[in-house]
Amino acid sequence: MKPRARRRKRASATQLYQTCKATGTCPPDVIPKVEHTTIADQILKWGSLGVFFGGLGIGTGAGSGGRAGYIPLGSSPKPAITGGPAARPPVLVEPVAPSDPSIVSLIEESAIINAGAPEVVPPTQGGFTITSSESTTPAILDVSVTNHTTTSVFQNPLFTEPSVIQPQPPVEASGHILISAPTITSQHVEDIPLDTFVVSSSDSGPTSSTPLPRAFPRPRVGLYSRALQQVQVTDPAFLSTPQRLVTYDNPVYEGEDVSLQFTHESIHNAPDEAFMDIIRLHRPAITSRRGLVRFSRIGQRGSMYTRSGQHIGARIHYFQDISPVTQAAEEIELHPLVAAENDTFDIYAEPFDPIPDPVQHSVTQSYLTSTPNTLSQSWGNTTVPLSIPSDWFVQSGPDITFPTASMGTPFSPVTPALPTGPVFITGSDFYLHPTWYFARRRRKRIPLFFTDVAA
């Protein structure tokens, strides 16, 4: 077998470019790579004309992170201290040799020549007046020890409390403290006594200075959602001892206002089939549903357990209606009953004494027959209310015809449109006259009967 030839590594693009550029035998990928004329170089060249990334350190390899530097992850930069005193340049101290004199000679100032400038003449008035005397008597001056108080105020740039007003330091001028105060004049002052505000104990007003504009809604108990199964319980033990419906041997009872926990064996039977596999009964809730007071509890079933200990089961809403919510009965004001001498009376009318003759005012129930005749007929109907405001009586009864004189020739059709016949009245509406009640001396109330009139 012929041995395989060893593969030699190709020279780099820079080495090939140095030898093949002059002869023109360079591969097509060498010249663009060395002269930076590839597609990527063209994109960077023309894209840099519109976007500037200077100062960010991109592609420099310095690792400085740009002008701002790198910030470690999970930390924030420390705040810079600003507002402090500005640094001043140091004062240059000239070295002094041991042989140099300790007395510094004064440097004479050179004369300043103002060419063409007007001469300034100091004013003769104002300013200080200097009085000199040639007395040889030494002056006696009262020199006393004075204490000068100097106050320095330093501001901390890291902590500044804007709510505290810093007092101004005293002003010093020639060793004297200048204090100014307004002039206080004596005037008459009026004394006004203070009164105590009236504190009312009524609950009509708000209890706080800024009452809430609206009342926050109470949290709603989602008892009728689709995730809950609705089960009605009729056993009265559900109100007082619900644990008896779930298990038999549960001697510990914590009360009806707390949630109940139950632990079952692998095989068990509940006293009530509706409470099978119940592992938790939540605290009760009393609600109103469609005019009923309802006692509710939410139960959790433990139908399935996972290896991690999680239980999977449905949630059930157990409820029992206690009693209906009755509305308040409407109150009707009743008038007092007044006993009178007569059997029939009106509570709104004044008492009456006259007793009319029963013969003149007799109304009996009878059958009346009305037949057509040549005389004109006059109809009359009177309605008397139940409450009569005066002391007179009117009988209301059926329509009765009264014969009157003929005022002209009556109109009678030749052929009647409908067959005519006699009209019979079989009933009437009326009140009996009070005089008929006195026939009986017993104080007995006679009921009034109302009948309809049929024609």
Curated annotation (Swiss-Prot):
Highly phosphorylated. GO terms for biological process: microtubule-dependent intracellular transport of viral material towards nucleus; symbiont entry into host cell; viral penetration into host nucleus. Keywords: Capsid protein, Cytoplasmic inwards viral transport, Disulfide bond, DNA-binding, Host endosome, Host Golgi apparatus, Host nucleus, Host-virus interaction, Late protein, Microtubular inwards viral transport, Phosphoprotein, Viral penetration into host nucleus, Virion, Virus entry into host cell. Disulfide bonds join 20-26. The keyword Nucleus does not apply. GO terms for cellular component: host cell; host cell endosome; host cell Golgi apparatus; host cell nucleus; viral capsid. InterPro entries: Late_L2. Pfam families: Late_protein_L2. One of its GO terms (molecular function) is DNA binding. It comes from the Viruses. A motif (Nuclear localization signal) lies at residues 1-11, 438-446. It is found in: Virion; Host nucleus; Host early endosome; Host Golgi apparatus. Belongs to the papillomaviridae L2 protein family. Minor protein of the capsid that localizes along the inner surface of the virion, within the central cavities beneath the L1 pentamers. Plays a role in capsid stabilization through interaction with the major capsid protein L1. Once the virion enters the host cell, L2 escorts the genomic DNA into the nucleus by promoting escape from the endosomal compartments and traffic through the host Golgi network. Interacts with major capsid protein L1. Interacts with E2; this interaction inhibits E2 transcriptional activity but not the DNA replication function E2. Interacts with host GADD45GIP1. Interacts with host HSPA8; this interaction is required for L2 nuclear translocation. Interacts with host importins KPNB2 and KPNB3. Forms a complex with importin alpha2-beta1 heterodimers via interaction with the importin alpha2 adapter. Interacts with host DYNLT1; this interaction is essential for virus intracellular transport during entry. This is Minor capsid protein L2.
